[in-house]
């Protein structure tokens, strides 16, 4: 039986929405055992199904906590959830808590994979024909060129997990020419080209991401996060503009009614709740970061992401890919 720990106190709507999403998931997936990690008050007047275990701890982390402080508070729901992965009690952990705190716990409690310089936050981004993977989406602000190569390798494994065959890789930059960007980007360009060969499509710009020019977009966390947040804002703008214009007159309202199925598909594609969560890849276990404002629907899907990651052996696939890169570059493991 697959086992997943969930941090009941992580997120803007914790614990009510987190618990509701977890219980809904437990009802639908009897082959998964959930470890509900929370404080005593979380479990008052709550009837748990057979495939849910209560793990009571003394502390929880606020959403504005610093990563260093998160590591010191070892009795928190997030820390203890990650510890369950470290001790092989569970196969995965899900949290909607502070991103920096979860990255710290993933890195130093769950532990980095051998030869990994930095774990990365790899995020699926909607494109016109499906998805691409953005790595890194905000976990590592400043990185080395060799780290960007590792982000590309891990991003490719994640893309394969999403069902993308023979993923194409691009480096996020300020232009498509090979000599664009800082020295870091220029050196990373050479490393990515050497490793991925024909599957490296060169530099890509922000406006290429949603068009599906590549399947994996490599970036440091600073630029990757800006790109992701810009896309989220643009998606919200599109939905808001459509809503406001539909209400302007009867003709618009009739047109909207006729195009209801189209709008529903657009809403579905742009709804972040349906993606649930994404992986911190490069650590010794499945660590899923759900959005901070996750409701019960988003938590349900985040747990589904964790379940799928376990079943696809995502961690071992990434570990093998990184080992191959390391051996090819340095001739040793």
Curated annotation (Swiss-Prot):
Subcellular location field: Cytoplasm
Known pathway: Lipid metabolism; phospholipid metabolism
Organism: Thermosipho melanesiensis (strain DSM 12029 / CIP 104789 / BI429)
SUPFAM superfamilies: Isocitrate/Isopropylmalate dehydrogenase-like (SSF53659)
Keyword Lipid biosynthesis (UniProt): yes
PANTHER family in alphabetical order: FATTY ACID/PHOSPHOLIPID SYNTHESIS PROTEIN PLSX, PHOSPHATE ACYLTRANSFERASE
Gene3D superfamilies associated with the record: Isopropylmalate Dehydrogenase (3.40.718.10)
The protein's name in its UniProt record: Phosphate acyltransferase
Subunit-level organization: Homodimer. Probably interacts with PlsY.
């Amino acid at each position: 039986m697959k086992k997943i720990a969930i941090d009941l106190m992580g997120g803007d709507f914790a614990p009510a929405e987190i618990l509701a999403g977890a219980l809904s998931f437990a009802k639908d997936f009897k082959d998964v055992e959930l470890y509900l990690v929370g404080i005593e008050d979380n479990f008052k007047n709550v009837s748990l199904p057979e495939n849910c275990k209560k793990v009571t701890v003394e502390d929880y982390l606020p959403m504005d906590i610093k990563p260093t402080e998160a590591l010191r508070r070892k009795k928190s729901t997030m820390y203890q959830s990650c510890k369950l992965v470290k001790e092989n009690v569970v196969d995965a952990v899900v949290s909607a808590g502070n991103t920096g705190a979860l990255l710290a716990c993933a890195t130093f409690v769950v532990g980095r994979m051998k030869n990994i310089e930095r774990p990365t936050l790899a995020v699926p981004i909607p494109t016109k024909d499906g998805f691409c993977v953005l790595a890194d989406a905000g976990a590592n602000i400043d990185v080395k060129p060799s780290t960007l190569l590792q982000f590309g390798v891990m991003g490719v494994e994640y893309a394969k997990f999403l069902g993308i065959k023979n993923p194409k890789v691009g480096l996020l930059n300020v232009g498509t020419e090979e000599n664009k960007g800082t020295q870091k980007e220029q050196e990373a360009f050479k490393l990515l080209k050497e490793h991925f060969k024909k599957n490296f499509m060169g530099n890509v710009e922000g406006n290429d991401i949603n068009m599906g020019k590549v399947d994996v977009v490599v970036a440091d966390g600073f630029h990757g996060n800006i790109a992701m947040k810009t896309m989220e804002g643009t998606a919200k703008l599109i939905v808001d503009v459509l809503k406001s214009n539909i209400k302007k007159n009867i003709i618009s309202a009739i047109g909207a009614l006729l195009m209801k199925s189209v709008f529903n598909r657009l809403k579905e594609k742009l709804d972040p709740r349906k993606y649930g969560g994404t992986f911190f890849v490069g650590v010794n276990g499945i660590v899923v970061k759900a959005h901070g404002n996750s409701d019960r629907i988003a938590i349900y899907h985040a747990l589904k992401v964790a379940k799928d990651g376990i079943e696809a052996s995502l961690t071992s696939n990434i570990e093998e890919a990184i080992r191959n890169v390391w051996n090819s570059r340095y001739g040793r493991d």
